[in-house]
Amino acid sequence: MSRGSRRTAVAAIALLAMGAAACGGGSSTKSSSSSSGSNSALVFGSSADPKTLDAAYVNDGESFRPIRQIFEGLVTTKQGGTDVVPALAESWQPSADGITWTFNLRKGVKFQDDTAFNAAAVCFNFDRWYNFKGIQQSSSISYYWNTVFGGFAKNDDPKLGVSLYKSCQAKDDNTAVFALTSPSSTFLSGLTLPAFSIASPDALKKYNADEIGGSASSPSFSSQFGTAHPIGTGPFKFSSWNRNDKLVLERNDAYWGDKAKLARVIFKPIADGNGRRQALQSGEIQGYDLVAPGDIGQLKSAGYQILERPAFNVGYIGFNQAKAPMDNQNFRQAIAYALNRDALVKAKYPEGAEVATQFQPPTLFGSSTSVPTYNYDPAKAKTLLANSGVTNPTVEFWYPTGVSRPYMPDPAANFQAFKADLEAVGIKVTPKSAPWSPDYLSAVESGNAQMYLLGWTGDFGDPDNFIGTFFRQKLPEWGFDNTKIRDDLEKARVETDLGKRTTEYKAINDEIMTFLPGVPYVHTKPALAFAKNVKGFVPSPVQEELFSLVTLG
C-alpha cells in the first residue's frame, strides 16, 4: 500500500440486508432481501467512501474493495492466498531473456457496456497509464504504477526513473504482447494489483477518465468514469452512488464466469469502529473488517462468525539513524534486547498473532531461520548500552493517535509497554504523538521522527514488496544509506530464478537484522466478523475478496 495508505490496511467492512432488518449474530432470522435467492442483497459497511472507482488513481482499501467486484486484471491471486492465477488472461509466457511477455486472453468476454474485451483493450489501458501526465504521475495518485513500473513515457518529475513498461502490442484479438525495458521478477505478481484492472476503452474515453483536478497532495477526482460509469468485466456492475450514504453494485448477469450468488452488494460507510460493531449487533449490518481484539471474544460468544486473514503484515519500531544516537549499533541493539515483544503480543493482540523476527511474514519465500532474534534480555541490553558510550541516553519515541491498524490496533498501548521496557534498562523516553494523517506520517516520512511505531501490509506475494519497499532506496525515515543492502535487494529483484531469489532473500534478511534498522515485533491475522447467515466469504492476505462467492443462508 502507498506511503500514506500502505499502512492503511483495508478498513472495516459490513454487510446489511437492503430494505429490511438484517440477521443478528447467532439467530437464524432473515429479511426477505437477505435470502440466498436471486434477489438477495448484501450491504457492506465500510469505514469510508471510495476516493474514486477508477482503479488507476487509488491506493486505499476502501476504494479497491468495490473496484475488485467491478473490474478484473489479466491475473489475480488464488482465493485465500498469494499465488498468481489466471483472470482475464488464461495463460502467459515470458521470453527466455525475460523482456517479452505474451498473454493469451479469454475469448468471448465483454465489458459491462457490451463492448468486446480483447488485446487492443488491454494495450489501450496500459498505454493510458504509461502516458499519464502532470499530477497523474505523482505517487499519491499513481502509486502502484510507480511501484511496479517506475516511470512514464515522458517523466514530468526528474526523480522518476526509466519505466519498466515499454510497449504493448495486440498480436491478434486474443494475444497481448508486452515489451519490458529489463527483466523483472515482480512484473507478473505486480499485475495482480487492482490498480491494473482492465476498463472499457469506450467508457474511459466517453466519460473523461483522465479528467482530474486539484493538486498532487489534494487531487479532485471528478470524472464521470470514476464516479458514475466505471465499466469493467467483473461479476458486479455499478448501479448508484450517494456519497456518505451508500454505493450499490448489482449482479452482472452477462458475466463470463460463474455468476454472482447475490443480486446486489451495498457498501455503506460507517466511519467509527465502535459504530460498525454496534451496527452489526443491532442487525443494521451483517459483518465488518478489522475487528478490535477486545471485541472478538464478545462477538464469538454472541454467535457471530470470526474469520481471520492469513498474516501478511509486520508491525515494527523504526530507527532514524540520521538522529544520534540511533546511528550507534550497540545502542540500537540495546533497544532491541530491552523490548519484551512476547509479552506485548500476548497481552495486546488477538489469538494468532506472532512475534516477528524480520521485516517480512514467515509465510513468504525468502524468510530466514538464521536471523538474529534479539530475544528479551534486559541484562544484555544494559551491557550493550554501557558499551555504546552514550551518556544520559534519551530517545524521542513517536506514536500515532486516532488510528487503528491490523499490526497496531492500539498504538498508545504499544508505546506505553515499550516505554516501560526501555526505561527499565536506563533509556529515558520522551513521548511524541500526532494524528495519523497527515501529521504523523509526514513527521516519520520526512525524517523528523527519531524512533517510531509503524507497519506495513503487503500488496502482493513477493519479498520485494516488504523489504524492498523499506530498504531498496534511501529513505528519510530510516536515515541511512547501506549500499550493500540496496545493491543486494536490487540484484534479488531482477533475478528470475525462484530458487536463487529465495536464497538471496534469506541472506538479505540476515543482513538486515544484523544491521538492525529497526525492530519488527508482530505479524497479525486481521479478523472479520459476520452474521451467522453469511456464507462463502474467503479472507485473503491481500484483500482479494470476492463477494460473488457469498450467499445469505
Protein language model regions, located:
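N-terminal lobe/hinge region of extracytoplasmic solute-binding protein
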Residues: 45-96, 127, 231-232
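Surface-exposed binding/hinge segments that line
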Residues: 138-212
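Aromatic- and charge-enriched surface segment that lines or borders ligand/interaction sites
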Residues: 90-141, 177, 325
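Detector for C-terminal structural segments
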Residues: 242, 338-366, 410-419, 439-553
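C-terminal motif of bacterial Sec signal peptides marking the signal peptidase cleavage site
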Residues: 19-22
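Append "and occasionally in soluble cytosolic enzymes with long acidic Gly/Pro-rich linkers
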Residues: 239, 251, 327-420, 424, ...
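Gly/Pro-rich hinge or "lid" segments in bacterial periplasmic/extracellular proteins
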Residues: 79, 183-186, 192-258, 264
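Ligand-site clamp/hinge motif
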Residues: 224-227, 241-243, 248, 252-298, ...
